[in-house]
């Protein structure tokens, strides 16, 4: 059985909302800006990313929130959701040909996760790098992070998980 779930919020994209709070959220914003500058040095003629797309990726990581200046406990929910998806998707795919998939679509960015790129622990936080090295210092693989000319207002998270016999047995 194929299970499809969509969560959406219309309005500002993740990036646009984060940009609006950069003055109040200076420490977090500077952290993301520094990550972007490190990644930008790795750009080549054939592999480069828009700032919006990389910031969207960074914002998914645990401990990052556009509203952290208001509430220090924020910045965990989305990564916990991605981790739960990865765990469920792995259980579903054991011994099966079905492949679970999750997309985060926000603004111009489409970020895709599957069983090849899942959240992992880095220090005390869960992060996602979208690369096979599982290293947030390296650029993401371009098949998992894309920039589209069409703008999507808000954020959509859609996931597809297959409910299989293996899934039921491994819960």
Spans of model-derived segments:
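Short, well-ordered loop/turn elements at secondary-structure boundaries
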Residues: 1-3, 98
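Short beta-strand element(s) in the Bergerat
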Residues: 3-5, 155
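Glycine-rich acidic phosphate-binding loop
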Residues: 8-14
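Flexible, glycine-/charge-rich segments associated with ATP-binding catalytic modules
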Residues: 16-171
